[in-house]
Amino acid sequence: MDNLRLHPDTIQEIKQRIDIVEIIGDYVVLKKRGRDHLGLCPFHDEKSPSFSVSPAKQMYYCFGCGAGGNAFNFLMELGKRSFTDVALDLARRYQIQIQTLEPAQKQELQRQLSLREQLYEIMAVAAGFYHHTLFQPQGQEALTYLDQKRCLSSATIQEFQLGYAPAGWETLYRYLVEQKRYPVAAVEQAGLIKARQSGTGYYDQFRHRLMIPIRDVQGKTIAFGSRTLGNDEPKYLNSPETPLFHKSKTLFGLDQAKTAIQKVDEAILVEGYFDVIALHESGIKQTVAALGIALSRDQVQSLMRFSQSKQIIFNFDADKAGINATQRAIQEIEPLVYSGQVNLRILNLPAGKDADEFIHSSAENKEIYQTLVKQAPLWVDWQIQQLLKQKNLKDPLDFEQVARGMVDILKRLTDQNKRAYYLQLCGEILSQGDSRLISLQVNNLSSQLTYGDRPGKNGSRHWQAKDPTSSLLEKAEALLLKIYLHCPQERPTIDQILTENDLLFSFAHHRLLWQKIDQVREYFNLDSDPDNQLPLLVQLAYLEQEGDFNSVESLFQLTETSAEDLFRANLRIPEAIAIMEKVPWESYQKHCFGKLQQLDPRTQAEDFRYYQEQWQKAHQEIQRLESQRLNQPLN
């Protein structure tokens, strides 16, 4: 839908109707402070809230990283989505009539919006159907399973809207398509039915299964998890990916857990649906689960938004598979873990039990579980404990293996204080109770860390571009354009410098962006732009006209690094200009050198001397500009 041309009246109505506090509040825990609202910034990692939302201005700003803008900017940056996608979602949310500039596109837009709304409706009706069927005679086996095997109360069954999918091949199909008259294509897109491979017709995706609705963070049903009640494989089966459901971005139970996570300032991540349900029933409601896939960074960051301390506790099974799952989860979010951006703890329950088994095995286990949560070791301590399992440090091979594992953990710790603490701890462990050996073991580990930190011949620099000059120029132009887009107060300075120095952008996609900026400023008379509408209007210009937006899309998004560049714009502008000025001088120097090679200094002495002087002048300018650039090198 990115090529849809939205009518300016539609965009203006959306801007007038939206409530930025309500929108951002879906993703960030906000607390009222005076006239504004404060929370943890979702665009960079912080422990103290510096993210401010102003309902009066309908703007947000982070004093930590400099991210700021309106509701459009927030949703575009957070979800890495296009302006059109965000505008359409907001229009749907606030029930705003969409106007486009082409009737055919308007029809396609209405079809897309109608389909999404229809999918939500179909999923809600299906959830109600499964839940109702659970209490019918055909659902008795499933209800008995929940009562006797899972020990769940009627209130919990109602709260999670658990249900039963009948054993028939076309039961849900007939209900949704033939009785409720939903289009068969929409029901198929919802992941509830499948087309038969041979012949015609459809059959139900879920049959003779216990059904568990999966909801988004707003509480809308977007998919189903299921457990077989017979011998069918697989034992657990989820909905396929659909327009509503993306497994790697969804956490089961987050809609019901988010308030508790905010209240107790921690989140517990378990393996299965019934672990979540059992813990919620026991009053431990800050619990969610991944959906049978490797944990993703997106899932962890969605949890972090609801906890100011960013404390997450992994409670996977304590068997070998669970230990491996914990290790994989740590690896998946390694940048967050090793840098300390998430306070991760690991809880393994006694006797290898999962949370559901543990809670239901004894009446006292609810209190015991809560105690174990408080005592759960930090992930580093847990990793060290895993290294020591079934190892005899008096055995040279075991000792060497443990020491290597410790070095591997320590070298990834970016916080020097944390590294020093665990370096001492590991030294004490390896000394095996002999205090005289502690300093020796610490020094030994430290020397390996120092050696390991040295870059090799093909070390961390292998990623650098093959053409550093071209790469540097592109970065400089991109930085200047980003400052121009996001810093209205710097635009007169940049305009003046570019005009006085007769500078042009060298890359085609940058020239096109500059052309669109110029057109938008002239059309909308943006000589003064206190609300910084330029980025939004330029993106709209790309959507309404031809142009490769992908090549410049990153310039409209603010990261922690780029926010720092904008904060230091007065230093970054001269640096970028210096690089851009170098290019024509380098070109002129090459021109002079070519002329010198063609001239005979004996017969063409005057011309030879002229180009020799010009070459030297260009060389001096290049040296001056390079020195100016190196004072504030581009990252």
Curated annotation (Swiss-Prot):
Query: Which GO terms fall under biological process for this protein?
Result: DNA replication, synthesis of primer
* Stored SUPFAM superfamilies: DNA primase core (SSF56731), Zinc beta-ribbon (SSF57783)
* Matches recorded under InterPro entries: DNA_primase_core_N_sf (IPR037068), DNA_primase_DnaB-bd (IPR019475), DNA_primase_DnaG (IPR006295), DNA_primase_Znf_CHC2 (IPR036977), DnaG_bac (IPR030846), DNAG_N (IPR013264), DnaG_primase (IPR050219), TOPRIM_DnaG_bac (IPR034151)
Give the function comment from the record.
RNA polymerase that catalyzes the synthesis of short RNA molecules used as primers for DNA polymerase during DNA replication.
Q: Which superkingdom heads the taxonomic lineage of this protein's source? A: Bacteria
Q: Which family does it belong to?
A: Belongs to the DnaG primase family.
Q: Which reactions is this enzyme annotated as catalysing?
A: ssDNA + n NTP = ssDNA/pppN(pN)n-1 hybrid + (n-1) diphosphate
- What region holds the Toprim domain? 265-348
Keywords of this entry: DNA replication, DNA-binding, DNA-directed RNA polymerase, Magnesium, Metal-binding, Nucleotidyltransferase, Primosome, Transcription, Transferase, Zinc, Zinc-finger
Q: How is the cofactor bound?
A: Binds 1 zinc ion per monomer. Binds two Mg(2+) per subunit.
Q: What is this protein called?
A: DNA primase
From which source organism is this entry?
Synechocystis sp. (strain ATCC 27184 / PCC 6803 / Kazusa)
Where are the annotated CHC2-type zinc-finger regions? 41-65
What domain comment accompanies this record? Contains an N-terminal zinc-binding domain, a central core domain that contains the primase activity, and a C-terminal DnaB-binding domain.
**Subunit (UniProt):** Monomer. Interacts with DnaB.
Q: Which residues bind Mg(2+) 2?
A: 317, 319
Query: Record's Gene Ontology CC terms?
Result: cytoplasm; DNA-directed RNA polymerase complex; primosome complex
Coiled coil (residue ranges): none
- Identify the cofactor(s): Zn(2+); Mg(2+)
Enzyme Commission identifier(s): 2.7.7.101
Query: Pfam families this protein is in?
Result: DnaB_bind, DNAG_N, Toprim_2, Zn_ribbon_DnaG
Q: Where does Mg(2+) 1 bind?
A: 271, 317
**PROSITE patterns xref list:** TOPRIM
User: Which SMART domains does the record cross-reference, listed alphabetically?
Assistant: TOPRIM, ZnF_CHCC
Gene Ontology molecular-function annotations: DNA binding; DNA-directed RNA polymerase activity; zinc ion binding
Query: Could you tell me which cysteines form disulfide bridges?
Result: none
